[in-house]
From Swiss-Prot:
It is found in: Golgi apparatus membrane. The chain crosses the membrane at residues 24-44, 50-70, 530-550, 568-588, 612-632, 672-692, 706-726, 735-755. Expressed in young seedlings, primarily in the root vascular tissue. This is Cellulose synthase-like protein B6. Keywords: Cell wall biogenesis/degradation, Glycosyltransferase, Golgi apparatus, Membrane, Transferase, Transmembrane, Transmembrane helix. InterPro entries: Cellulose_synth, Nucleotide-diphossugar_trans. The keyword Cell cycle does not apply. It comes from Arabidopsis thaliana (Mouse-ear cress). Belongs to the glycosyltransferase 2 family. Plant cellulose synthase-like B subfamily. SUPFAM superfamilies: Nucleotide-diphospho-sugar transferases (SSF53448).
């Protein structure tokens, strides 16, 4: 319960990051873009069809920059003060923590274990926490790993709290060598913890290699004769915090769940798993707040729960209307820092409007909001209005919305009315939890319209806009060090596939009932709508692909793409200012020029591969030809994570030894790499043809072709941006472009070079 005294310092503050200099730069770039468009309109009749194509592409780029400028206009974030929490709040609220996983091969159990261990050891009362792991793969190996982790955490959590360990994921903590003296108490405890963690890793790895011995354990009987897409509901209470004495009271609840899946029933991928987590946790612990993280996103800040509670427990109307608190998505092995820069500027910009967009991980939700409440359903003190009480609390409405489980309906009523749940034995609730996991439980209910929303493989964007449409706000906290850290897919096929899924899900939002294009009377601010349009920027992939080919086409056909004479300064100034601006954004955050270049290159590649094929996926779905599937991204764990002694000792830097070599790019024979290879070959052919003509002194300067210097520079810039493909022409193995991809791209290049508008 929070203290209402106004004399106490606030739990959190809204920090504004407005910068008039950045506004001027953004507006200047926008003016230059519009000037270029106006110049093309004035001279459209004097030039060929190429100018019309360029005009359409540049119109798309200008529209996107207009949206970006609007979003970044008033950046803000919330700054929490968790050290003030104990003074202001006498009884901290409970928090349920969700960790979904789906495939023990692509998401190794040891990764899940480290994430769970980091959550179970956070600085928060253990009796107020519960961790639920949803296993959509129904893997006995995942359950076994959690059982072993529950034994290890009984010594790990007290160790972390005793020595105030910051990084509480063991695989990261033990990367750094011991610096204490050998005879110190800490040194002895550290070595003991390292040995125990190595034992844990070995047990998990041994079970991974040969899991047949698990069949002899009666506790694994529920996993017999199961398949990932065909099995009954399994709910296992791995560890229950019953108070107790000593170290046992330091460990929160840990529950393993796997919902029923049958081949002929829709299960809605991760979204369905999140709704099952919502129902099971409501039955068992019914915490008013919930944290969800991806299975590889460990808690890097032990006070992260307390930081989020500072927002929710602040005595203000805004805190009552805050639906979720979003932390940035950061990575310890990132091949690009573009996401860090993006979140620093764009996420803060959105946070200054109605609040950040939910990004699927590192987010604290309010249970009442996920149960379907709108902001208008609450009084100023946070209680339900009389109208909302009649709508939500009638018996018919409860069954129609939430299903036939009496236990779940009772827990929903308690959650909506903010009633505290009496302590219950989790073991006694397993049967009720299994009932709400049946594959037919959601039929003829509102699940999918409340909770995590269906109709998109990007459940985060879809759910986020549904929340903001109901009038709720959200909060953005970006602490230093980052609250959560995760792993990125390898540079190449895995990253491309993941971005394709993200892009496909984002475009799906345009065509469902949560679309920002419709419902202008809903309770969402206009600039917040623009923020969701920015998320859908992947639709610019076609203009991006075309624009990468235009300079080469003009060189090959002796035609002009860019203005001539003094007006060429518009293009030069625009490109130069944009490059310097984005470079400054990287360097001001401490990143290198090389990091900026790699990020620019990678995002051009993603735009012409992942985003391009996501449009194809949407078209095929709309035509009813195919459905969009959910592809689990492979989580890679470096050898240094296993806990075994490493020959090379990393330094004290948190990320030492884990960064991928910049510029290394992996290829496979999938169609994703044909566009990039095609772009590279076309621009190389255009440059080669131009040099040959220049050498023969037969290149014509008339006919509207100009000196072709601008087009040549454009081709050279595109070659630089697609440099990984140039390297791939000469590499072998996974770093080389497969012959099948190269031959298809070469065939397209020949067709392109011989075509004339």
């Amino acid at each position: 319960m929070a203290d209402s005294s106004s004399s106490l310092l606030p739990l959190c503050e809204r920090i504004s990051h407005k910068s008039y200099i950045l506004r001027i730069v953004d507006l200047t770039i926008l003016v230059l873009l519009f000037s270029l468009l106006w110049y093309r309109i004035l001279h459209m009749c004097e030039n060929n069809t190429i100018w019309l194509v360029a005009f359409l592409c540049e119109s798309c780029f200008s529209f996107m920059w207009l949206i970006i400028t609007c979003i970044k206009w008033s950046p803000a974030e919330d700054k929490p003060y968790p050290n003030r929490l104990d003074e202001r709040v006498h009884d901290l609220p409970s928090v349920d923590m969700f960790v979904p996983t789906a495939d023990p091969v692509r998401e190794p159990p040891i990764i899940v274990v480290n994430t769970v261990l980091s959550l179970l050891a956070v600085n928060y009362p253990a009796n107020k926490l519960a961790c639920y792991v949803s296993d959509d793969g129904c893997s006995p190996l995942t359950y076994f790993s959690l059982k072993e982790a529950s034994k290890f955490v009984k010594i790990w959590a007290p160790f972390c709290k005793k020595y105030n360990v910051r990084v509480r994921a063991p695989f990261r903590y033990f990367l750094n060598p011991l610096v204490a003296t050998d005879d110190s108490v800490f040194s002895k405890d550290w070595k003991m913890m390292k040995r125990e963690y190595v034992k844990l890793c070995r047990k998990v790895e041994d079970a991974t290699g040969d899991s047949h011995w698990l069949d002899a354990d009666d506790d694994f009987e529920a996993f017999s004769n199961t398949k990932p897409n065909d099995h009954s509901t399994i709910v296992k209470v791995v560890w229950e915090n019953k108070g107790g004495v000593g170290d046992e009271k330091e460990v929160p609840h840990l529950v393993y769940i796997s919902r029923e899946k049958r081949p002929n029933y829709l299960h809605h991928y991760k979204t369905g798993a999140m709704n099952f987590l919502l129902r099971v946790s409501g039955l068992m612990t019914n915490a008013p707040y919930m944290l969800n993280v991806d299975c590889d996103m460990y808690a890097n800040e032990p006070d992260v729960v307390r930081q989020a509670m500072c927002v929710f427990l602040q005595n203000s109307k805004n805190s009552n209307h805050c639906a979720f608190v979003q932390f940035p998505q950061n990575f310890y092995d990132s091949y690009t820092n573009e996401l860090v820069v993006l979140q620093h500027y764009m996420k803060r910009g959105v946070a200054g409007i109605q609040g950040p967009i939910y990004i699927g991980s590192g987010c604290f939700h309010t249970r009442r909001v996920m149960y379907g409440l709108s902001s208008d359903d609450l009084e100023d003190d946070g209680s339900l209005s009389s109208v909302a009480s009649r709508e939500f609390l009638s018996e018919d409405s409860l069954v129609r919305k939430y299903g036939s489980s009496k236990e779940l309906v009772k827990s929903v009523v308690d959650a909506l009315q903010r009633k505290s749940n009496p302590q219950k034995s989790l073991a006694n609730l397993v049967e009720a939890a299994q009932e709400v996991g049946h594959c037919h439980y959601e039929y003829q209910t509102s699940w999918g319209n409340l909770g995590w929303l269906y109709d998109s493989v990007a459940e985060d964007t879809n759910t986020s806009i549904g929340i903001h449409l109901r009038g709720w706000t959200s909060s953005f906290i970006s602490p230093d060090p980052p609250a959560f850290l995760g792993s990125t897919p390898s540079v190449g096929p895995e990253a491309i596939v993941q971005h394709r899924r993200w892009a496909t899900g984002s475009i799906e939002v345009l065509f469902n009932k949560q679309s920002p294009l419709i419902g202008f009377r809903r309770k969402i601010k206009f600039r917040q709508r623009l923020a969701y349009f920015w998320v859908l920027m992947c639709i610019r992939s076609i203009p991006e692909l075309v624009y990468c080919l235009l300079p080469a086409y003009c060189l090959l056909n002796n035609s002009a793409l860019f203005p001539k004479g003094p007006c060429l300064g518009i293009i030069v100034t625009l490109v130069g200012m944009h490059c310097l601006y984005t470079l400054w954004q990287f360097m001001i955050l401490g990143f290198s020029v090389k990091s900026w270049y790699v990020s620019q290159s990678l995002w051009r590649i993603i735009a012409t591969s992942s985003w391009l094929f996501s449009i194809q996926d949407i078209i095929l779905k709309l035509l009813g030809i195919s459905k969009i599937g959910f592809i689990v991204a492979k989580k890679n764990m470096p050898e240094t994570r296993s806990g075994y002694e490493s020959k090379s000792k990393p330094s004290q830097g948190e990320d030492d030894g884990l960064k991928l070599e910049l510029g290394k790019f992996e290829f496979d024979s999938s169609c994703h790499f044909i566009p990039g290879t095609f772009i590279m070959l076309v621009n190389l052919a255009a440059l080669a043809g131009f040099l040959v003509r220049l050498q023969r002194s037969s290149y014509s300067h008339g006919g509207g072709g100009g000196s072709a210097l601008a087009e040549t520079c454009g081709c050279a810039m595109i070659v630089m941006l697609f440099f990984p493909f140039l390297k791939g022409l000469f590499e072998h193995g996974k770093y080389g472009i497969p012959l099948s991809t190269l031959s298809k791209a070469a065939f397209l290049t020949v067709l392109f070079a011989s075509y004339h508008l």
